[in-house]
């Protein structure tokens, strides 16, 4: 499950063998347009009048942001429930302390926090577990194992793999997030000898900051060969 910039969330229903059963783009364009309009008015007001008397306007923007986050979190949990998911996997976010940076950046990260919090509450009611994986490189690396991607300058929702293939950035990231969860779950249940053997054959799975969906497929293939031997 990727909390993207281009869409509010991209969900993929994934089995442990890497089979993707379903996927969904969750987006609330009218709510985002409204928030963007408010932020534009705040920016113009600051240019004309400075930062004084801006607090109430930022408070309104934050309320809109919170409502958008809660709608997104509920939608994620409901989608997982409809598809009989056992666990929802997020990227790990630092959930404590202050958020630094520009106010627009603060709103975006704060929204991600609120989405996760709301989704966890809703998921627990459905009996669905919530887990987290390392966020490093989930968007930067192509899910097919071809390496770092480049962004399409004409369409920021798309990225270009080194093979020249165009793909949705957030969808690729959602595959990598799901794969990191399954890689971790598979590896930790194995006896030490089997784990060492698989890690020697698929060394990428030892690097939790750079493993991708393609590594899960290779791991499952090697694991199948190991069990058949």
Where do the PLM segments sit?
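Short hydrophobic beta-strand that contains or immediately precedes a catalytic carboxylate
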Residues: 1-4, 168-169
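Positively charged, low-complexity nucleic-acid-binding target-recognition regions
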Residues: 105-106, 110-229
């Amino acid at each position: 499950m990727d909390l993207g910039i281009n869409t509010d969330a991209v969900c993929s229903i994934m089995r442990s063998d890497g089979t993707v059963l379903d996927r969904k783009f969750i987006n609330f364009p009218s709510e985002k347009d409204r928030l963007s309009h408010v932020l534009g008015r705040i920016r113009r007001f600051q240019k004309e009048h400075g930062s004084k008397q801006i607090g109430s306007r930022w408070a309104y923007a934050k309320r809109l942001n919170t409502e958008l986050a809660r709608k997104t979190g509920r939608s994620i949990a409901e989608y997982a429930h409809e598809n009989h998911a056992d666990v929802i996997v997020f990227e790990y976010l630092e959930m404590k302390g202050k958020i630094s940076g520009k106010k627009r950046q603060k709103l975006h990260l704060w929204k991600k926090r609120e989405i996760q919090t709301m989704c966890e509450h809703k998921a627990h009611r459905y009996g669905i577990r919530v887990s987290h994986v390392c966020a490093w490189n989930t968007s930067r690396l192509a899910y097919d194992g071809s390496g770092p991607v480049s962004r399409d300058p004409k369409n920021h929702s798309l990225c270009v793999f080194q093979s020249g293939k165009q793909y949705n950035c957030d969808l690729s990231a959602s595959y990598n997030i799901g794969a990191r969860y399954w890689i971790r779950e598979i590896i930790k249940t194995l006896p030490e000898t089997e784990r060492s053997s698989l890690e020697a054959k698929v060394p990428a799975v030892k690097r939790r900051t750079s493993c991708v969906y393609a590594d899960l497929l290779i791991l499952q293939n090697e694991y199948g060969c190991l069990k058949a031997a």
